[in-house]
């Protein structure tokens, strides 16, 4: 990005604004609270407390045009091979809508629709049985997305199925889950793109044995033959996924099977509708009015121009408590790259460390560091305008904290006692959902997906591969025999010492 024609101008704006006080920016642009706000369907965004002004934003958008961001969106939606290292499309948008006239995208949408109807039929069959509980086994993209959505949208009571998620290879996770269940009234779903994932195979074997066979086992995989063979699952209970959908973008596919069981098939379709509506906004809205573009460019500004190494996400709705963990994978696995599309080294820092938690709990853990620490941490505050629980006073208090914390972080407060002084200058974006509905959550997740893509285009990196996860897995498979007592040549001296400790 530093090699673009507009970078010097952008850098000059950063030098000008780096030490600017956020109240001064608001005073200089009196209409800023509304001019820097956007409403897209059920989502409201306010960027007024970010440390840029109109001139800096214009410079950011100039680089986005130089990087052909609009063309990049067209290539994504039309199913071109934007995943250049694996020579694949990234057609997660086609799982939820048919928004272009590109044949490859339309065919992908039709294929996804057919599989979704198959999934609906399987749900109807399960509803006709005595099954009350579902154990969903997967990891990474096969777990984080479904777990987030199921937890966020499940009814407080009265759901037809209770869905339990197991991801970690640690046997304690499976033991604790199965201890509360009756195998005669439980079904299992094994989700793995390749069906070669160690965690899923080991946990799947435990579940298969506990259920007493494969009669109530289902699978979702891009390798359905291997899935069926590994656990003797009838082909009719195996749903496909595809190599043109990355795991962290796959909750909209049959990977969402446990979501549909947890919240109902109709509400699962509403989730997809909300995402598709936001997709349409991204595809059809000029860059300057495009919320995903503004969110992504804000992240680039904070990372590359203001030097922020981390980004916090605070969800002021307990039902969204798992969103920070989901976004960690979406953002950091997509953008944790050090080389550009052509294999040359990047010319600027890429992804920040994303982290966070649920408010107001986080105010009593790490907010001390946000307010008075030496690092400035940009943040997203996410809340809901309307709650649907009967405790209105609690929701009012929750939203008061959103308003108070974002104001305090931005404005600070002077004191004659330095221990009680707040420097301010901490930027944040506020995102408000009208209510936590399937449509709103679908739109919110879609926004973050597209924000990630914006950042990848600005940095010239591939958001859709993840080779960085492979080396550790390869080494683990080589070391496993050594932990079982076999003779293995281990070159690393520290690993040898640790092996000796583990083997006693």
Curated annotation (Swiss-Prot):
It is an enzyme of class 5 (isomerase). GO terms for biological process: gluconeogenesis; glucose 6-phosphate metabolic process; glycolytic process. InterPro entries: G6P_Isomerase (IPR001672), G6P_Isomerase_C (IPR023096), Phosphoglucose_isomerase_CS (IPR018189), SIS_dom_sf (IPR046348), SIS_PGI_1 (IPR035476), SIS_PGI_2 (IPR035482). Gene3D superfamilies: 1.10.1390.10, Glucose-6-phosphate isomerase like protein, domain 1. Keywords: Cytoplasm, Gluconeogenesis, Glycolysis, Isomerase. Induction: Inhibited by growth in complex medium but induced by culture in plant extract. One of its GO terms (cellular component) is cytosol. This is Glucose-6-phosphate isomerase. It comes from Xanthomonas citri (Xanthomonas campestris pv. citri). The lineage of its organism: Bacteria, Pseudomonadati, Pseudomonadota, Gammaproteobacteria, Lysobacterales.
């Amino acid at each position: 990005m530093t090699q673009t024609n507009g970078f010097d101008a952008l850098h000059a704006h950063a030098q000008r604004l780096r030490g600017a006080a956020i109240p001064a920016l608001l005073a200089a642009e009196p209409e800023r609270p509304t001019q820097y706000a956007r409403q897209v369907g059920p989502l409201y965004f306010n960027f007024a407390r970010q440390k840029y002004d109109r001139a800096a934003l214009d410079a950011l958008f100039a680089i986005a045009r130089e990087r052909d961001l609009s063309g990049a969106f067209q290539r994504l939606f039309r199913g071109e091979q934007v995943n250049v290292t694996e020579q694949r499309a990234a057609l997660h948008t086609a799982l939820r809508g048919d928004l272009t006239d590109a044949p490859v995208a339309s065919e992908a949408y039709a294929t996804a629709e057919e599989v979704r109807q198959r999934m609906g039929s399987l749900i109807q069959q399960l509803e006709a049985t005595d099954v009350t509980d579902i154990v969903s086994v997967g990891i990474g993209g096969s777990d984080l997305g479904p777990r987030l959505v199921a937890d966020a949208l499940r009814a407080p009571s009265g759901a037809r199925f209770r869905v339990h998620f197991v991801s970690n290879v640690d046997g304690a996770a499976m033991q604790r889950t199965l201890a509360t269940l009756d195998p005669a009234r439980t079904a299992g779903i094994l989700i793995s793109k390749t069906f070669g994932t160690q965690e899923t195979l080991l946990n799947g074997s435990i579940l298969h044995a506990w259920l007493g066979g494969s009669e109530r086992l289902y699978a979702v995989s891009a390798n359905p033959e291997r899935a069926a063979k590994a656990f003797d699952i009838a082909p009719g209970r195996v749903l496909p996924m595809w190599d043109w959908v990355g795991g962290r973008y796959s909750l909209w596919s049959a990977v969402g099977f446990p979501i549909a069981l947890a919240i109902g098939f109709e509400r699962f379709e509403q989730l997809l509708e909300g995402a598709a509506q936001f997709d349409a906004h991204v595809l059809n809205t000029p860059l300057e009015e495009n919320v995903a573009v503004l969110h992504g460019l804000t992240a680039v500004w904070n990372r590359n121009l203001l030097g922020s190494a981390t980004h916090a996400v605070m969800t002021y709705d307990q039902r969204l408590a798992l969103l920070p963990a989901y976004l960690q994978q979406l953002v950091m696995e997509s953008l944790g790259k050090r080389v550009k599309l052509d294999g040359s080294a990047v010319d600027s820092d890429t992804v920040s460390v994303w982290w966070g938690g649920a408010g107001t709990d986080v105010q009593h853990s790490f907010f001390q560091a946000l307010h008075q620490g030496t690092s400035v941490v940009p943040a997203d505050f996410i809340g809901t305008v309307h709650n649907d629980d009967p405790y209105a006073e609690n929701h009012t208090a929750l939203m008061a904290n959103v308003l108070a914390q974002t104001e305090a972080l931005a404005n600070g407060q002077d004191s004659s006692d330095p221990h009680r002084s707040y420097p301010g200058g901490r930027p944040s974006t506020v995102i408000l959902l009208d209510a936590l509905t399937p449509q709103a959550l679908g739109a919110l997740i879609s926004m973050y997906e597209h924000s990630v893509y914006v950042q990848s285009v600005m940095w010239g990196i591939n958001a859709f591969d993840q080779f960085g996860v492979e080396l550790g897995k390869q080494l683990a498979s080589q070391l496993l025999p050594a932990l079982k007592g076999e003779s293995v040549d281990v070159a690393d001296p520290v690993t040898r010492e640790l092996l000796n400790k583990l083997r006693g």
